[in-house]
């Protein structure tokens, strides 16, 4: 959608501060839609964060999907939230206190593999993809954002 492309552009600017080669492409809402579907409990309330993240991880990595990619999520109420604030909220989910892309903040960070390499031997690549879907919690409008990035083996420093 146009709104997800605009948010992707804003986010790209923010991520470039952490990784000057970063690009962010808006993709369809499929991943975010799947994430939003498992975000609420049976009563329709938003799950507590740890449960929500675990359930989204289970949903998005079914059948070993995205095993070579980091998955970050952000979700928040959208009342009075413009594209810049949306992008800032998403950037917070990806960037660590050191100002770099933080793969430990990815919901599946401990499971990502590149060939037989994992953990500290791998890092996020440069191509980020953003999936965004609006959903409701009671009467409140929320957005679910899923950002994925293929992992790569760290270059020897």
Per-range role (PLM):
Residues 2-65, 126:
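Short, well-ordered surface patches within globular domains
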Residues 56-157:
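A well-ordered secondary-structure block
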């Amino acid at each position: 959608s146009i709104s997800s492309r605009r948010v992707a552009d804003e986010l790209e600017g923010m991520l470039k501060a952490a990784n000057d080669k970063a690009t962010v492409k808006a993709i369809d809402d499929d991943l975010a839609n799947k994430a939003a579907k498992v975000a609420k409990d049976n009563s329709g309330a938003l799950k507590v964060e740890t449960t929500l993240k675990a359930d989204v991880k289970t949903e998005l990595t079914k059948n070993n999907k995205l095993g070579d990619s980091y998955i970050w999520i952000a979700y928040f109420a959208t009342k009075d939230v413009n594209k810049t604030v949306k992008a800032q909220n998403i950037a917070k989910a990806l960037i660590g206190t050191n100002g770099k892309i933080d793969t430990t903040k990815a919901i599946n960070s401990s499971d990502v593999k590149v060939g037989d390499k994992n953990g500290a031997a791998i890092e996020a690549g440069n191509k980020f993809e953003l999936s965004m879907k609006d959903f409701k919690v009671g009467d409140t409008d929320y957005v679910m954002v899923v950002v994925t990035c293929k992992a790569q083996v760290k270059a020897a420093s």
